[in-house]
């Protein structure tokens, strides 16, 4: 895949080699792409980076990463991060991407959504402390900003909007906020090297098919040449990222991010309404946008935010620039998923 090759070049340019990566949430959208980049870069640039892909299901990991199983630079580990991380693992970098990340999971597994982020992250930070890990990247989210108070257009890293904490849906956002605070506590008490990535809404071909986010459902409609189903008026205005840009940004944060700092990550020309997102896919697929009412489970998982645009000046000041055009990335995502599902 050309995008993996492009981001692999970033890895080579940053001269990240002979390092051991422990990737939590390896089977997720970002984790899968990140691992593909590391393995491709090993093959092309002989970087000799080692990958430990961590998830809750060994069988799922074996299925996803079957092409890497025989590679000496790759291994998998079945771990529940809500328990102590096994001490026999060794790594230089940790990427904490383990979390429920879509609305249906927030509604049907609300406790797991919270514990994986808070208890799981603490277990990972304890492991990082014991093992004297070089750097941990914590995957946070645009959702920590809450609702825009209509006093600003873009969220910079100092902004804090409103979250009604006395709701089921607050679990994900508040868990991410608490996990960020936990990172700061470990930095203060144990001098851990942690960098926080506040990532916008992400799309890409490595998404899990069970993901219930509106953007993923639109893409799956496009993959199956179906009318695109919109379950609201579609006025919500959000920043999005193609997964290739997210991984490129994470690589830069591993190399150049400042300890203890948080960085917004969003894609190129990617501030669009939900309706625009749906129309882009319908136009490409030559279908229509249809409005349907959500069911009760879907309603419980929906974000209450209506405007969530990220200011990405801070990470750009480190030298990062998004590479992938929004519409082209949507089209590539659909075509790659079609090939994988129907070939």
Predicted segments, located by residue:
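Amphipathic terminal alpha-helices
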Residues: 1-15, 36, 46-49, 326-343
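N-terminal Rossmann NAD(P)H-binding glycine-rich loop of SDR-like oxidoreductase domains
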Residues: 20-40
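Conserved Rossmann-fold NAD(P)-dependent oxidoreductase catalytic core, especially the SDR/UDP-sugar
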Residues: 96, 122-169
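Conserved beta-loop-beta element that borders a ligand/cofactor-binding pocket
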Residues: 141, 180-205, 216
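Glycine/proline-rich active-site loop of Rossmann-fold NAD(P)-dependent oxidoreductases
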Residues: 149, 177, 203-217, 226, ...
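Conserved C-terminal active-site "lid" loop/helix of NAD(P)H-dependent oxidoreductases
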Residues: 243, 276, 298-321
